[in-house]
Protein backbone atom coordinates (compact mmCIF):
# COMPACT_ATOMS: atom_id res chain seq x y z
CA UNK A 1 0.00 0.00 0.00
CA UNK A 2 1.65 3.24 -1.13
CA UNK A 3 1.23 6.36 0.91
CA UNK A 4 -0.06 9.37 -1.04
CA UNK A 5 1.73 12.54 0.04
CA UNK A 6 -0.42 15.65 0.22
CA UNK A 7 1.16 19.05 -0.09
CA UNK A 8 -0.37 22.42 0.68
CA UNK A 9 0.57 25.84 -0.57
CA UNK A 10 2.66 28.10 1.63
CA UNK A 11 0.07 30.88 1.50
CA UNK A 12 -2.65 28.54 2.79
CA UNK A 13 -0.37 27.24 5.57
CA UNK A 14 0.32 30.75 6.84
CA UNK A 15 -3.36 31.77 6.59
CA UNK A 16 -4.32 28.66 8.56
CA UNK A 17 -1.76 29.56 11.24
CA UNK A 18 -3.23 33.08 11.53
CA UNK A 19 -6.77 31.68 11.78
CA UNK A 20 -5.67 29.29 14.54
CA UNK A 21 -4.13 32.27 16.38
CA UNK A 22 -7.47 34.14 16.24
CA UNK A 23 -9.41 31.22 17.68
CA UNK A 24 -6.73 30.47 20.28
CA UNK A 25 -6.83 34.12 21.39
CA UNK A 26 -10.61 34.09 21.71
CA UNK A 27 -10.56 30.81 23.65
CA UNK A 28 -7.83 32.21 25.92
CA UNK A 29 -9.93 35.30 26.63
CA UNK A 30 -12.92 33.06 27.30
CA UNK A 31 -10.72 31.27 29.84
CA UNK A 32 -10.24 34.69 31.43
CA UNK A 33 -14.00 35.05 31.80
CA UNK A 34 -14.16 31.64 33.49
CA UNK A 35 -11.50 32.74 36.01
CA UNK A 36 -13.07 36.10 36.88
CA UNK A 37 -12.93 35.26 40.60
CA UNK A 38 -9.11 35.31 40.44
CA UNK A 39 -8.54 38.80 39.13
CA UNK A 40 -4.81 38.58 38.31
CA UNK A 41 -5.31 35.34 36.36
CA UNK A 42 -8.22 36.85 34.45
CA UNK A 43 -6.07 39.83 33.44
CA UNK A 44 -3.26 37.52 32.26
CA UNK A 45 -5.69 35.49 30.13
CA UNK A 46 -7.14 38.65 28.58
CA UNK A 47 -3.71 40.11 27.83
CA UNK A 48 -2.48 36.84 26.27
CA UNK A 49 -5.66 36.49 24.22
CA UNK A 50 -5.45 40.07 22.99
CA UNK A 51 -1.79 39.62 22.04
CA UNK A 52 -2.66 36.47 20.09
CA UNK A 53 -5.38 38.26 18.13
CA UNK A 54 -3.05 41.21 17.42
CA UNK A 55 -0.32 38.80 16.29
CA UNK A 56 -2.77 37.08 13.96
CA UNK A 57 -3.64 40.46 12.43
CA UNK A 58 0.07 41.08 11.83
CA UNK A 59 0.41 37.64 10.21
CA UNK A 60 -2.59 38.36 7.96
CA UNK A 61 -1.03 41.69 6.86
CA UNK A 62 2.31 39.95 6.23
CA UNK A 63 0.79 37.13 4.16
CA UNK A 64 -1.25 39.72 2.26
CA UNK A 65 1.92 41.50 1.19
CA UNK A 66 3.52 38.16 0.29
CA UNK A 67 0.44 37.18 -1.69
CA UNK A 68 0.69 40.39 -3.72
CA UNK A 69 4.30 39.53 -4.66
CA UNK A 70 3.56 35.86 -5.41
CA UNK A 71 3.74 34.71 -9.01
CA UNK A 72 0.30 33.87 -10.42
CA UNK A 73 0.26 30.65 -12.48
CA UNK A 74 -2.33 28.31 -13.96
CA UNK A 75 -2.19 24.82 -12.45
CA UNK A 76 -1.67 22.19 -15.18
CA UNK A 77 -3.84 19.65 -13.31
CA UNK A 78 -6.98 21.57 -12.35
CA UNK A 79 -6.40 24.56 -14.69
CA UNK A 80 -7.33 27.05 -11.95
CA UNK A 81 -5.24 30.15 -11.15
CA UNK A 82 -2.97 29.79 -8.12
CA UNK A 83 -0.01 31.66 -6.63
CA UNK A 84 3.53 30.39 -6.13
CA UNK A 85 5.98 31.43 -3.44
CA UNK A 86 9.55 30.27 -4.00
CA UNK A 87 10.91 27.75 -6.50
CA UNK A 88 8.50 24.97 -5.52
CA UNK A 89 4.99 25.22 -4.11
CA UNK A 90 1.67 23.39 -4.29
CA UNK A 91 -1.56 24.36 -6.03
CA UNK A 92 -4.02 26.02 -3.63
CA UNK A 93 -6.91 24.03 -5.09
CA UNK A 94 -5.75 20.50 -5.99
CA UNK A 95 -2.47 20.30 -3.97
CA UNK A 96 -0.48 19.46 -7.13
CA UNK A 97 3.28 20.11 -6.65
CA UNK A 98 4.39 22.98 -8.89
CA UNK A 99 7.75 24.42 -9.92
CA UNK A 100 8.87 27.16 -12.28
CA UNK A 101 12.50 25.99 -12.25
CA UNK A 102 13.29 23.92 -15.35
CA UNK A 103 16.06 22.08 -13.42
CA UNK A 104 13.50 20.71 -10.92
CA UNK A 105 10.96 19.39 -13.45
CA UNK A 106 10.40 15.66 -13.01
CA UNK A 107 12.27 15.55 -9.68
CA UNK A 108 10.45 14.42 -6.50
CA UNK A 109 8.81 17.41 -4.75
CA UNK A 110 10.64 18.64 -1.65
CA UNK A 111 10.30 21.99 0.10
CA UNK A 112 14.07 22.09 0.70
CA UNK A 113 14.40 23.35 -2.89
CA UNK A 114 13.29 26.77 -1.59
CA UNK A 115 16.15 27.05 0.93
CA UNK A 116 19.12 29.30 0.25
CA UNK A 117 21.55 26.43 0.86
CA UNK A 118 20.03 24.42 -1.98
CA UNK A 119 20.08 27.39 -4.39
CA UNK A 120 23.88 27.72 -4.02
CA UNK A 121 24.47 24.10 -5.07
From Swiss-Prot:
Keywords associated with the record: Cell membrane, Membrane, Transmembrane, Transmembrane helix
Keyword Magnesium: no
Membrane-spanning parts: 14-34, 43-63
Coiled-coil residue windows: none
Keyword Nuclease: no
Signal peptide: none
InterPro entries: UPF0295
Similarity comment: Belongs to the UPF0295 family.
Protein name (database record): UPF0295 protein OB0906
Species assigned in the record: Oceanobacillus iheyensis (strain DSM 14371 / CIP 107618 / JCM 11309 / KCTC 3954 / HTE831)
